[in-house]
């Protein structure tokens, strides 16, 4: 019932409209009320079709080439996901869909951005997608490669006090990855299974 509290939804709308970000997974803001299932469907650019929903044109173009899906080589795993999600509004972009229904949608709302996932089970790839979604929703995509590795099975940890960087292979297989520091490609690394490689941060 919090989602039909006008103060709650107005506060969130104001936050996003002024440049904030919103990320929803599954059934965020769900509460059937006044013809909407998602009470912030205008912010997210999606709603869920219910048995009594009005007929809506759901045949949309899917554009998988987006900042959030860069470095992603295989299909996104949405798990069981939430069914019957359709995009709506004037400022959305569908990044993944299943038939006529949407699975991953980004939306512009005022000066802000939202990202909607029908589902997001844990996996290294989904962790990377979520990371990219956070930077996108925050309106800071250019900041992501401040310290960054391209391979989803690798990660980077920074120790600024010692100017050292640890690049870690989280998998049981050899992995190749590109290391970016302050937006510049610094080195291409080949890491043994579970290897942690120390790199000097000379930037």
Task: Give the residues covered by each predicted segment.
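A conserved amphipathic helix/loop scaffold
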Residues: 3-203
């Amino acid at each position: 019932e919090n989602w039909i509290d006008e103060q709650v939804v107005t506060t969130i709308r104001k936050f996003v409209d002024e440049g904030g970000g919103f990320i929803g997974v599954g059934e965020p803001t769900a509460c059937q009320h006044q013809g909407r299932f998602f009470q912030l469907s205008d912010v997210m650019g999606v709603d869920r079709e219910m048995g009594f929903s009005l007929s809506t044109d759901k045949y949309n173009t899917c554009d998988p080439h987006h900042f959030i899906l860069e470095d992603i080589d295989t299909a996104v795993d949405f798990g069981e996901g939430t069914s019957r999600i359709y995009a709506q509004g004037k400022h959305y972009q569908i990044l993944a869909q299943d038939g006529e229904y949407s699975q991953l949608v980004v939306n512009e709302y005022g000066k802000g951005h939202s990202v909607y996932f029908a589902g997001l089970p844990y996996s290294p790839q989904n962790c990377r997608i979520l990371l990219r979604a956070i930077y996108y929703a925050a309106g800071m995509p250019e900041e992501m490669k401040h310290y960054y590795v391209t391979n989803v099975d690798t990660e980077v940890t920074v120790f600024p006090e010692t100017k050292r960087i640890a690049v870690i292979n989280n998998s049981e297989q050899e992995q190749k990855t590109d290391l970016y520091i302050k937006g510049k490609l610094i080195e291409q690394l080949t890491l043994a299974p579970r290897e942690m490689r120390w790199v000097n941060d000379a930037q």
